[in-house]
Design a protein with these regions (language model features):
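A helix-boundary/hinge signal
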Residues: 1-354
């Protein structure tokens, strides 16, 4: 989740300060199926795993078999020569170990002066890469020679690990002076130019504050879920359970990062209210009391339906607690950008801040 905060603040800083920089959003082609077993073993040994542990992992990875199912007919089992089995609880951990080698290669190149990251005034030595599983974002200073070095690093990593980068599905975003050479960068990497907002870990990223239209994905999820319940004659108690356990949880991830616009909040409450009073949300039905009363706790006469506005503020306040009690990359970025060595009590809200 911290990666979303870093991504949002970086994009906002590059755009508002008109700084030069490049963001490269990488797409791996069938990531889990391409991992080379030999590279995995070398990575485990490099990270200090014992030989016994490496042998266990080798037996687990190479000991599996697969079969092909065509028209309900399952073929004979056979062994594969590379890749990690999807659905296995160990596979994500091993994939992260392999993918982390890309970050190591980039950090070594940065230490040698071959590449430089963005926003060095907020992040020590500049921000160069963000990784979460197979979601990888690369940040690069506006310099064509550095871009060539980065392309070479990606090709080397692809050859060593087996993780093939799908450049045709990858996207590049240019800021400041880099926009004038966007075509050259695009041709170098063989990718497309990205547009805002784009999604990172399921969250829309934009250089401005999100508008009502950017929340349409949440409203669409509400409507799709409600359409599956349409026509089912459930009781008030049944609909109350569905409200609290399913419908109210749909926007939680977005509410953890952004303040919900008032118009979006009203529409989501309208969908929930319509479903509660009538199983068909498209049909109007007389409401016996205000929705605010329904959202009150049971000991105050309500039904305990989740108040999205209050929940939104609670989720956002968790970031404040983490900011004051942590020392990670995103905490240092926010402190350097907003606090600048001052205590939090001296911070003032400025219009237009992210």
């Amino acid at each position: 989740m911290e990666g979303v905060v870093i991504m949002h603040e970086t994009v906002y800083e590059l755009h508002t300060k008109k700084m030069d920089g490049i963001i490269f959003k990488i797409d791996f082609e069938k990531a889990y199926d391409k991992v080379k077993w030999q590279f995995l073993q070398q990575t485990l040994r490099m990270k200090g795993f014992s030989q016994s542990w490496c042998n266990w992992i080798s037996n687990w990875v190479e000991g599996g078999t697969v079969s092909v199912k065509v028209n309900d007919n399952v073929g004979k089992n056979f062994r594969t020569c590379k890749g990690l089995r999807q659905g296995d609880p160990m596979s994500p951990i091993l994939f992260n170990i392999v993918a982390d080698m890309l970050a190591i290669l980039i950090e070594r190149a940065k230490a040698d002066g071959q590449i430089r990251g963005v926003i060095p005034h907020l992040v020590d030595d500049g921000l160069s890469i963000l990784q979460y599983a197979d979601d990888t974002i690369i940040f690069l200073e506006h310099d064509f020679e550095q871009a060539k070095n980065m392309k070479a690093i990606l090709c080397v990593f692809e050859h060593l690990s087996g993780l093939k980068i799908n450049f045709h599905k990858s996207e590049i975003f240019c800021f400041g002076g880099a926009k004038e050479m966007e075509d050259q960068y695009r041709q170098l990497f063989g990718c497309n130019s990205g547009s805002f907002p784009f999604r990172y870990l399921g969250i829309p990223i934009h250089y401005r504050k999100l508008r009502n239209s950017d929340w349409k994905c949440v409203e669409d999820r509400f409507q799709r879920k409600l359409s599956t319940w349409k026509g089912k004659n459930s009781s008030y108690g049944g609909r109350l359970v569905l409200l609290n356990s399913v419908l109210s949880s749909l926007p939680m991830f977005m509410l953890s990062f952004f303040e919900i616009p008032r118009g979006v909040l009203q529409r989501l409450d309208y969908y929930r209210s319509s479903f509660f009073w009538s199983s068909d949300s498209q049909k109007k039905k007389y409401r016996l009391t205000k929705w605010d009363y329904i959202c009150r706790p049971k000991d105050q006469g309500g039904l305990g339906v989740l108040n999205l506005d209050i929940m939104n503020r609670c989720l956002l306040s968790k970031w404040l607690f983490k900011l004051l009690n942590g020392d990670g990359l995103w905490q240092n970025l926010l402190r350097n950008k907003y606090l600048k060595g001052k205590p939090l009590s001296h911070m003032s809200h400025k219009p237009g801040t992210s």
